[in-house]
Amino acid sequence: MTLVKYTKPAVILHWLIGVAILYNLISMLILDDNARSRPFIELHKSIGITVLGLVLMRVLWRAANTPPSLPDSYKPWERTLSHIVHGLLYLMIFAMPLSGWIMNSASLNKNTGLPYSIDLYHIVPWFNLPLFNGMDIAARKGWHEFLGGVHSLSGWALLALVVLHVGGALKHQFLNKEKELQRMWF
């Protein structure tokens, strides 16, 4: 049987997004909001905005290029679960950076009274969304806390989906002896 692989652009986008998400999920678990963590928080934001751009590219690529079919050996419930997990992964990979960006736009730096800036990798200034301009400090703080909760819960949901995705790939590779990992490699 011939191995049907993903296209090289799909593979590159998959692994770039995967590594970026892995960093941001790990940083979510170990960072706190203090001065020592600020450089890592800034990197977290830069990676999040990068993921947003990469996932948009991935969705456009996928719309124009049909991915390979799942192997015939997949059971119906595995096919259904695979489609559900992939759909939710795309949703969360898009929602996570977007919710972080909106949350940052609602933030106020204690020293300046302005929203925290986002400078992608300390090189490219990125803009905050004007959704909260003119809003009083208490309302902004309330939105920032609410959006922080949404971003945090979404992070846990994304982590669970990543575990399902990786677990499914490893199950098919090692238990079912299918060349699952080779399909998403160069």
What are these regions (language model features)?
Residues 1-186:
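Membrane-embedded alpha-helical bundles that constitute the cytochrome b-like, heme-associated redox core
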